[in-house]
Swiss-Prot record:
Expressed by the venom duct. This is Conotoxin S5.1. One of its GO terms (cellular component) is extracellular region. The keyword Secreted applies. GO terms for molecular function: toxin activity. The cysteine framework is XVIII (C-C-CC-CC). It comes from the Eukaryota. Contains 3 disulfide bonds. It comes from Conus striatus.
Length: 44
């Protein structure tokens, strides 16, 4: 499960400008994106 969260974190950091990763499964996985970059998940 940690691998999924780590992968989600990497994807968020590399794609957050598109604001496509902080939704659904990745956003639910510990809300990693929100913790790292609030602007990434603010569109939720």
């Amino acid at each position: 499960h940690n691998d999924l969260i780590r992968a989600g974190l990497t994807v968020c950091l590399s794609e957050n400008r598109k604001r496509l990763t902080c939704s659904g499964l990745l956003n639910m996985a510990g809300s990693v994106c929100c913790k790292v970059d609030t602007s990434c998940c603010s569109s939720q």
